[in-house]
């Protein structure tokens, strides 16, 4: 009986250690190498297949300096205004999210920074639980410890979902505007950024009033967006 209990404890601990060792190895690799495909991309494409949707993956890696500063500022203004200065976590946002989750009785609000969103995109799935949020936090801490801010942002820019099967700034720019990501205007960048929280909803509701309102909010905030110090774009 004691041996069974020991195995029941050791097995999940071993899986946790193995998974985090795998993640850490990939984080080190991604400091210099572009991901072939993220966990979120694989999950999403499998979902489309199960739903009977004929969707092809459009994912085109683009170096950081060849992505418009307008898009960088728009995303920081909308998703994580303190990105350049924090260590991966916005503690004020996390506290607000905890209060909202407690009031609702469910894990809804995440208070996620760009770094946390990237951790989810690279290695996790879309499920919402305190265990998954804990794993996301562990991955975020590892990533922030060994990866420059501009590289984190570069990985994020190239892994964001923007439409059915459309991932990354370059693919989105080509899909929506038929131009490279380097040439995005402020208006175009704001429109793309407004889609980020719910890309598939806005894919189905392209004339949504919420999308227009969000675009205008992003445009107003872009001027004060602070990029990472190493950004020389």
From Swiss-Prot:
Highest taxon of the lineage: Bacteria
Keyword vocabulary terms for this entry: Cell inner membrane, Cell membrane, Cell shape, Cell wall biogenesis/degradation, Glycosyltransferase, Membrane, Peptidoglycan synthesis, Transferase, Transmembrane, Transmembrane helix
EC supergroup of this enzyme: transferase
Metabolic or biological pathway, per its Swiss-Prot or TrEMBL entry: Cell wall biogenesis; peptidoglycan biosynthesis
Membrane topology: Single-pass membrane protein
Subcellular localization, as worded in the UniProt entry: Cell inner membrane
Coarse class of the protein's main subcellular location: membrane
Catalytic activity line of the entry: [GlcNAc-(1->4)-Mur2Ac(oyl-L-Ala-gamma-D-Glu-L-Lys-D-Ala-D-Ala)](n)-di-trans,octa-cis-undecaprenyl diphosphate + beta-D-GlcNAc-(1->4)-Mur2Ac(oyl-L-Ala-gamma-D-Glu-L-Lys-D-Ala-D-Ala)-di-trans,octa-cis-undecaprenyl diphosphate = [GlcNAc-(1->4)-Mur2Ac(oyl-L-Ala-gamma-D-Glu-L-Lys-D-Ala-D-Ala)](n+1)-di-trans,octa-cis-undecaprenyl diphosphate + di-trans,octa-cis-undecaprenyl diphosphate + H(+)
Biological process terms in GO annotation: cell wall organization; peptidoglycan biosynthetic process; regulation of cell shape
InterPro entries noted in UniProt: Glyco_trans_51 (IPR001264), Lysozyme-like_dom_sf (IPR023346), PBP_transglycosylase (IPR036950), Pep_trsgly (IPR011812)
Pfam families per UniProt: Transgly
Gene Ontology MF term list: pentosyltransferase activity; peptidoglycan glycosyltransferase activity
Enzyme Commission designation: 2.4.99.28
GO CC terms: peptidoglycan-based cell wall; plasma membrane
NCBIfam families the record matches: mono_pep_trsgly
Designated name of the protein: Biosynthetic peptidoglycan transglycosylase
Originating organism: Neisseria meningitidis serogroup A / serotype 4A (strain DSM 15465 / Z2491)
Gene that this sequence comes from: mtgA
